[in-house]
From Swiss-Prot:
PROSITE patterns: ADP_GLC_PYROPHOSPH_1, ADP_GLC_PYROPHOSPH_2, ADP_GLC_PYROPHOSPH_3. It comes from Mycobacterium sp. (strain MCS). Keywords: ATP-binding, Carbohydrate metabolism, Glycogen biosynthesis, Glycogen metabolism, Nucleotide-binding, Nucleotidyltransferase, Transferase. GO terms for biological process: glycogen biosynthetic process. Pfam families: Hexapep_GlmU (PF24894), NTP_transferase (PF00483). The lineage of its organism: Bacteria, Bacillati, Actinomycetota, Actinomycetes, Mycobacteriales. Its EC number is 2.7.7.27. This is Glucose-1-phosphate adenylyltransferase. It catalyses: alpha-D-glucose 1-phosphate + ATP + H(+) = ADP-alpha-D-glucose + diphosphate. The gene is glgC.
Length: 404
């Protein structure tokens, strides 16, 4: 087995996630449940741990209690071996202020870097759904001789306004990096696609420290990794791009190779769940060679009684479907669906109860929602807009603990 370089993982998990409201009303975006058994942060942590990067600091800020608890309960590594995944809330080490941006979060947490003294630093976001082997990107970074490496992926040009757009030469050196342009340029071989940043970076340690310090002294900076740090290093000729399509994950299928989803909106979050439910899913949760680790609750198996059924669906542990019909849906743990209820094309989070004869369609129900007997969600959008959030794509989102 090849000896790994000394790498520190920093996961940026302070995102507020306003576009995912109401799912982020009571929790940080990386703590939002996903896929029936996980939270969003589990994907980046699984990728790092599977690659044997076992010294990880998770920088948190916004409503971080459930995120901190999830990490502490479900991501315990061997302290005796010097391994750790530790949530680090804003420490206010530099005065009575919170993080003002992702770069400022690292600046205020520089003691973590000094204590670990790594050769390289992996800085990844905490709110994307994907599999990736970070070791391959680190090796690319080392061989390229760059000071910073940005993971890049092709997306439709119409969607690129939400990302940092990359232009690189044939060797992979980045010539320009524009954060969230109004009119993104297409790629040379396909004008309808753009090459964008995934928000995952590798840095040589000294390069990151110097860039973060310089940014902290710049009063005109927004102190953002994508908006300020990467453009600074691009202008210095120190940044390269790693093409995510070259990343080979053990056990990946042809369908889910290169799968990556930004789930920052209700529609994107919903669509990513629908990617899970087909017989041959676009994203396969069942890859045992690169497992996604999540909640470790000790729950009974799911149960179907009185003719209850689920088709093309994911059903979490502890759930009971009684004489009800579930289709094309993702149910988390401890969901109860009563006699005659119909759930179609929906995402149901832990502890939710759907009453006798109720109908739920094209909806996201957060934790501990109670849908009363005969009630309907996602059937009459005009009525739903008066009481819930409805996305541009017509997805009805019901907040945590609401009784209907």
């Amino acid at each position: 087995m090849r000896e790994l370089p000394h790498v520190l993982g920093i996961v940026l998990a302070g995102g507020e996630g306003k576009r995912l409201y109401p799912l982020t009303a009571d929790r940080a975006k990386p703590a939002v449940p996903f896929g029936g058994a996980y939270r969003l942060i589990d994907f980046v942590l699984s990728n790092l741990v599977n690659a044997r990067y076992l010294r990880i600091c998770v920088l948190t800020q916004y409503k971080s209690h459930s995120l901190d608890r999830h990490i502490s309960q479900n991501w315990r590594l061997s302290g005796l071996a010097g391994e750790y995944i530790t949530p680090v809330p804003a420490q206010q080490r530099l005065g009575p202020r919170w993080y003002t941006g992702s770069a400022d979060a690292i600046y205020q947490s520089m003691n973590l870097i000094y204590d670990e003294d790594p050769d390289y630093i992996v800085v990844f976001g905490a709110d994307h759904v994907y599999r990736m082997d970070p070791e391959q990107m680190v090796q690319f970074h080392i061989e390229s001789g760059a000071g910073a490496t940005v993971a890049g992926i092709r997306v439709p040009r119409a969607e690129a306004t939400a990302f940092g757009v990359i232009d690189a030469d044939e060797s992979g050196r980045i010539r320009s990096f524009v954060e969230k342009p109004a009119d993104p340029p297409g790629t040379p071989d396909n004008p309808d696609e753009a090459f964008v940043s995934m928000g995952n970076y590798i840095f040589t340690t000294k390069v990151l420290i110097d860039a973060i310090r310089a940014d902290a002294d710049d009063d005109d900076s927004d102190h953002d990794m994508g908006g300020d740090i990467i453009p600074r290093l691009v202008s210095d000729g120190m940044a390269a791009v790693y093409d995510f399509s070259n990343n080979e994950v053990p056990g990946a299928t042809e369908r889910d190779h290169g799968y990556w989803r930004d789930v920052g909106t209700l529609d994107a979050f919903y669509d990513a769940h629908m990617d899970l439910v087909s017989v041959h899913p676009i994203f396969n949760l069942y890859n045992k060679r690169w497992p996604i680790r999540g909640e470790s609750e000790n729950l009974a198996p799911a149960k179907f009684v009185n003719g209850g059924s689920a088709q093309e669906s994911v059903v979490g542990a502890g759930s009971i479907i009684s004489a009800a019909s579930v289709r094309n849906s993702v149910l988390s743990s401890n969901v109860y669906i009563d006699d005659g209820a119909i759930v179609e094309g929906s995402v149901i989070m832990p502890g939710t109860r759907i009453g006798r004869g109720a109908v739920v369609r094209h909806a996201i129900l957060d934790k501990n929602v109670v849908v009363g007997p005969g009630e309907m969600v996602g059937v009459d959008l005009e009525k739903d807009r008066e009481r819930f959030s409805v996305s541009a794509g017509g997805v009805v989102a019901v907040g945590k603990g609401i009784w209907i």
